[in-house]
C-alpha cells in the first residue's frame, strides 16, 4: 500500500499499515471454513446415516474410524477458521505511522489482541529520530523493512509483518520519510 506523498507545505505524514485484513488471510479463512464444514458434515453424515452433503455420499463411510476422524478434523478446522475470522475482525497488526512537524512527534500505532495492550501506541519526539534505515535481506526467506533509528531506543520497525514490500515501494517510502523528517537514509 503506497504511502501518502508529503510536500514541503504539509506538516504531517501518515502511512497506513495493513494488518491481518490482507487478501491472503481472507482466502485462508474462507478455504478453512468451507473445508472444515465439509469434513464435519461428512463425519456427522456417517454417524447419523443421513446425507448432509448434497454432492457426495458420506453415509457409505464407516463411522469408525473414517467418519470420526473426518468429524474431528472438521472441528479442528472450524476452530482454526474461527480464530482467523476473529483476528481479521480485530485487524491485529493494523495501524499507522504518523509524523507531525507541528507537534514535533512521531506516533507508531498498531492494533493488538483484546486485553490490556489492545492499543499499542508509541510516541517519540522528532528530535530523537536519527535516521531512517532500510533493511534488505534476499534469499529463501526475504526481509525488506524500514526502521526508525531513535536516540537511546534502538531501531523501531515501521513496515507491516508478512509479505515483503516490493523494492521500489520500500525505497520510495524510505526516501519520502527521510526527506520529510530531514534525516539520512541508511542501508541502500
From Swiss-Prot:
It is found in: Cellular thylakoid membrane. GO terms for biological process: photosynthesis. This is Photosystem I assembly protein Ycf4. InterPro entries: PSI_Ycf4_assembly (IPR003359). It is a multi-pass membrane protein. Belongs to the Ycf4 family. It comes from the Bacteria.
Amino acid at each position: 500500500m503506497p504511502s501518502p506523498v508529503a510536500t514541503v507545505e504539509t506538516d504531517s505524514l501518515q502511512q497506513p499499515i495493513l494488518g491481518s485484513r490482507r487478501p491472503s488471510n481472507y482466502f485462508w479463512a474462507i478455504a478453512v471454513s468451507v473445508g472444515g464444514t465439509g469434513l464435519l458434515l461428512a463425519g456427522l453424515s456417517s454417524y447419523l446415516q443421513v446425507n448432509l452433503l448434497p454432492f457426495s455420499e458420506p453415509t457409505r463411510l464407516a463411522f469408525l474410524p473414517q467418519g470420526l476422524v473426518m468429524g474431528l478434523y472438521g472441528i479442528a478446522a472450524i476452530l482454526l477458521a474461527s480464530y482467523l475470522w476473529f483476528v481479521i475482525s480485530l485487524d491485529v497488526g493494523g495501524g499507522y505511522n504518523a509524523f507531525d512537524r507541528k507537534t514535533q512527534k512521531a506516533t507508531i500505532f498498531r492494533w493488538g489482541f483484546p486485553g490490556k495492550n489492545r492499543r499499542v501506541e508509541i510516541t517519540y519526539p522528532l528530535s530523537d529520530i536519527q535516521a531512517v534505515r532500510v533493511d534488505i535481506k534476499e534469499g529463501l526467506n526475504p526481509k525488506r523493512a524500514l526502521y526508525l533509528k531513535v536516540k537511546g531506543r534502538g531501531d523501531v520497525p515501521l513496515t507491516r509483518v508478512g509479505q515483503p514490500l516490493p523494492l521500489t515501494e520500500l525505497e520510495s517510502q524510505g526516501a519520502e520519510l527521510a526527506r520529510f523528517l530531514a534525516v539520512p537514509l541508511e542501508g541502500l
